[in-house]
Amino acid sequence: NLNKNKKETIFNHDLKINSEKYLEVTNKLIPTGKIKKVKNTINDFNNFQNIGEKITIIKNKKIKRVSNTINQLGFDLTFCIKKNSKNYLASLKNKKTNIQLDFYSNLPGVQLYTSQGLRYKNKLAPYQGVCLETQHYPDAPNNKNFPSTLIKPNKLYKYFTKINIS
């Protein structure tokens, strides 16, 4: 949450994700193995999009999202990152506070979670946080069309995530 008052929602945050595809999931949020295109869908964040507007569209159109497991609507989805030389992943900004986070990683995916299910001892409420979690594709060992997560002996693996704050 990039607001000064952390009790405010993330509805005034804008998000951009370097992705043309996302992982389809079951109603239990398990990847089906299908990779879907984001173009012309509610999941398209290729240009900065307001998170609050996207969630409002989901609610108003009553789009059934698989993340609606606890009667809340929002995002809980893995995006497949487009490969690029600078490892650019995503940007999150708040125009009101003028804070921006730019994410870089060599991992192939990022999980977007808009905290629709967030409840913590009356201190946190739904939509008071947003998570961008760099990762391999969930359930990759069971989906041969996903990038491999097999770790071989005597081979060095280096993964990084970098966040620039401005």
What residue spans do the PLM features occupy?
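An exposed, glycine/acidic-rich loop-and-rim segment of catalytic or binding clefts
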Residues: N1-S166
